[in-house]
Amino acid sequence: TTKYEKLQSDYNELKKFTNVSKNKLNIIDYLNTNLSCKEFDFNDFCKSISLNFCNSYLDIIFKNDYVIGVSQIIINEIEKIKLENIYNLPIYAFNHKDGILYIYDNTIFSWIQINDKYLKTLIKEVSKNLLKAFLIWKNENETHFLQEQFSEIYVLNMKKVIGNNFDNRNKDIMIKNHIYKHIKVSIKNIFEIN
């Protein structure tokens, strides 16, 4: 039993140390010190969505819904950047703070926690491109169906494209949470990035 008590004591001590270390860790300071995205910040990332937007993204919305579709489009763009250069990624998330995204903003030369303004900018960029793609889809497909059939498909897809079945605040948070769940990394891995 002395061995067990010693192990339990060591475990409790390590647990206290981990909790203290975790609370003292400042992610923004760490990111500012170790990851600079001066060549490609969050605003550049938002613009790149327009540049890289493809019609298959509209299919993602049609097959799913607005929240899952927009989340997947943003995640796809994040994955493309990761493949090119993970150190150029202007958006991060860590598992120690649930639902928090960190972004790099060149206008203030710093990493910050994403706020509603930045989140809306990101989602608006995707939505704007979805609407353009949807208009093209409508024009191309209007004659391929019977009028009544097309009307049903059009209304169903339009609801998905504009996110009609979610209230505004709710869908933005849901999108942010989907992105967070996909890109979060373990706090333990933060030191392995370097």
What label would you give each PLM region?
Residues K22-N194:
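Extended amphipathic coiled-coil helices
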Residues T1-V20:
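Heptad-repeat coiled-coil/leucine-zipper oligomerization helices
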